[in-house]
Amino acid sequence: MGWSGSPLTLPPLRGSPPLPQVERDRTQPQLLAFADAFPSEGRGELRSRERRGEATGRGGLRMTAPTRPLGHLYLVATPRPGQSEAEFLRRVEDALAGGVDTLQLRCKADSGQYGEARPYIALAERLRDLAHARNVPFFVNDRVDVALAAGADGVHLGQNDLPVEWARLMAPGLRVGRSTHRPEDAARALAEAPAYFATGPVHATPTKPGRVAAGLGYVRHIAALRPTLPWYAIGGIDLGNVQAVLDAGATRIAVVRAVLDADDCAAAAHALREALMVNG
C-alpha cells in the first residue's frame, strides 16, 4: 500500500533563502519513502518494538539517543557491485573487529536493490546490530527516512542533501553529520553545528568520481581553525598516505576502499587504528 495523501512538505526555515530546486527534488522522494516504508500492516512490528523497550519517535519510528561516542576511524561501508550481502556484512564485521569505531552505510539511488527504501532499511538494520554490539555509532548516508526506520544513531548529509536544520526538524533524535569540500562549506558547517563534519576528498577517489581533490591544504586549513566539533579527513586515505594526513593536523579519518576492499579487512582497520593511536 502506497502513500495516498496530500503531498508532503516541510515548512520554510526562518531567515533562510528558498531551497534550491536540486534539494527540493531530493527532499520530496525522501518524504514519500518515509510515509511509504511503514504502511498500516507494519504497525504490529512497531508496537512489538515498543514492548521490547526500544525508544520510538513520532509515528512509532525508533530513534536512538546520542550516547555512543564518535570514534577516530570511520568506515563508510558501500556495497560493491556483484558482492553478496553476506560477504558485505562479513567484511564490515571484520572491519569493526579490527578497530573501526564509527560506521556509516552508504547506498545511493543507483545502488541496485538498495536504491529502494525497504531493502535499504533491512540492510541498515543488519549493520546497526553489528555496530551497536560493539557500542559503535551507526550513521546512514543521505536518507533521514532510512536512518529513522532502521534505528540508526544519525544521518550523514552531503552538500546537496537536506539542510541540517530540516533534518533536525524531521528527526530530532538523530545526530547529523555534514560533508564539506572547501573553506566556505566548513564555515557553514561550523554555523550549523552538526555532530561532526567531514573534510575532503583529500585525494582523488573513485568513490566520488569527477570531484576535484581538496588536498592536504584543506586539512591544514581546518586544523588551523581548531574547531570544537569533531571532524574527519576523508577521500583516498590509506595506510600509505595516512601519516601525511595526520601531519597536516587531522586526528580522525574516514575511509572506504582502504578497509573494505582489503584482503584482510580486520588487519587493514587495525593498521590504520594503530597509526591514529600513535599520533593521538
Curated annotation (Swiss-Prot):
The gene is thiE. NCBIfam families: thiE. One of its GO terms (molecular function) is thiamine-phosphate diphosphorylase activity. It catalyses: 2-[(2R,5Z)-2-carboxy-4-methylthiazol-5(2H)-ylidene]ethyl phosphate + 4-amino-2-methyl-5-(diphosphooxymethyl)pyrimidine + 2 H(+) = thiamine phosphate + CO2 + diphosphate; 2-(2-carboxy-4-methylthiazol-5-yl)ethyl phosphate + 4-amino-2-methyl-5-(diphosphooxymethyl)pyrimidine + 2 H(+) = thiamine phosphate + CO2 + diphosphate; 4-methyl-5-(2-phosphooxyethyl)-thiazole + 4-amino-2-methyl-5-(diphosphooxymethyl)pyrimidine + H(+) = thiamine phosphate + diphosphate. This is Thiamine-phosphate synthase. Residues 42-55 have a biased composition (Basic and acidic residues). The keyword Transferase applies. 4-amino-2-methyl-5-(diphosphooxymethyl)pyrimidine binds at residues 104-108, 141, 179, 208. Belongs to the thiamine-phosphate synthase family.
